[in-house]
Amino acid sequence: YGVERMRLLACGMLLQQGMYSILPMYYDYTSFLSSATYPAINMLLSEAFALKGRLTVGRSLVRPSDIEVVECLKKKSLREILSDDSLSDKLRVEIFKLQGKNLASILSAFVNPDELYRFSERIASRFQFDEITFDRFAEDFQLELGLDLIPILDRVYQTVGLAILDVRDIRVEQVVTEGYPRYLLSFKVRNISDVDGVITCVADNQTIEELRDVYKNAIPPDLDASLKVQDYVIAAGACKEVKFIMYGDCGYISTNLSANLPREYYIEVVREGISKTCDQCEGIFDIDSNLFHEPGVIIVDNASSQFQLVDSGQPKRLPFFAKEQKKVYKMVFDNVEWTEIITSTSYGIPVQSAFCKLAGEGNGKAIWTVNVQKAGKYEVFFYHQFLSMTGPPVSSVFTGSLLHYRICNEVLDENVVVEADLVPEGWVSLGKFDFSVGEVQVILDDRGGNIRMDAEDQNLNVIVSSTEQSLPKRQLIIADAVKLVRVKE
């Protein structure tokens, strides 16, 4: 009996999951939403209205399924995905989950999320013993909440492609006010695609000081802290500035279901030396698109055809040379050959990617070729990031880490050595140089520094355990992006 019972339970669980769940057959139309126009609408709206579990302040990594979803939605609409039997059920379920969460963010940009949740509860209670058709649901939704679902769902089901959101100039300032600390998060965002997108700002709803006062310095370790959330639709081609008051010290900006990878920009308030502001205005504001253009600036990213890799003296590949080749990203940082990775601290739009490898003898190289069209003096920058892992202990910023750059053209050839552990993340200057019209190459070789066993890791987010302290520490070499900025004479 026990064996048969377990088999039955296992089969039951399988039949209740995925695109082909049999549970609706037993609802007797008590909580199932049906529509001939929008297939699987019940599953989509179930995800959208499950607002209680869609937001956290936890850090998430890019999963292989995220990349699969992006590649699929670049080529197919949701309606086409539903009828494409060549796609796995697992991928289609993942797409529906992300589409549902994205729909929730779109709706929350117009209607308070708590009102959305209460509306779904009222509908379920009101039609407890009746069939719920989507037409009736949409009619009540517009009557009670003032929003027409039809055009929104038409776009969800018919749109091919994803929004590409250029988020920049992220800034956190402390608001000058009495009481507990408050912070103003501001940033600019431009939608460089022809598909509408949505931005979500999320932050803790209380500072650590407030929580200590509420719980008398005995904050429960499993406390489910409340969050402050605001969603904004960023129309195709729009340029906006967003201002968001943070009541806590941590939060993030999410680009939701977009071509951006990773989809989140994490915010951690550093109180020491923070700038102050009296501005307490929050919302979304139109800005000039010229704010996103930088005259006299040339950037070559690792995703460019002007970027090349060399492993052990042999040219490797141009990463985007073969457009039809499937992109493969890895979260493995200790390879002896160049490996393409996605990290939240890399440069790139829409994919924040870079190449990394273990330090070698100088045979491995990353080469950026920049076409200078106007002669003059330029300042050359490279994009630097802190990247570490504990097993085995490798880091881009161990004490003693060095980066060996070479800047050259037909008349210039200069070497620059950078102490990687002593410079900040982001754009770091390699110096100013006079360039004539033509090609300039910036070359990074894989020589590192002399990393001792007692070297410290400047990336304070990583703690090396005692079992790993006996392993040799190795430097990571990271190749991301370079920038030339014309210097005004």
Per-range role (PLM):
Residues 174-257:
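Beta-strand-rich binding/interaction modules
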Residues 1-77:
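Zinc-dependent metallopeptidase catalytic helix centered on the HExxH motif
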Residues 141-198, 203-206, 430:
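A terminal-accessory region detector
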Residues 81-105, 109-115, 207-230, 238-240, ...:
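Ordered, small/hydrophobic-rich secondary-structure cores
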Residues 90-95, 126-128, 174-177, 231-234, ...:
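Short, contiguous acidic/charged loop-to-helix segments that flank catalytic cores in large enzymes
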Residues 283-489:
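Extracytoplasmic
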Residues 247-284:
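Terminal connector regions
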Residues 82-170:
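Amphipathic alpha-helical substructures
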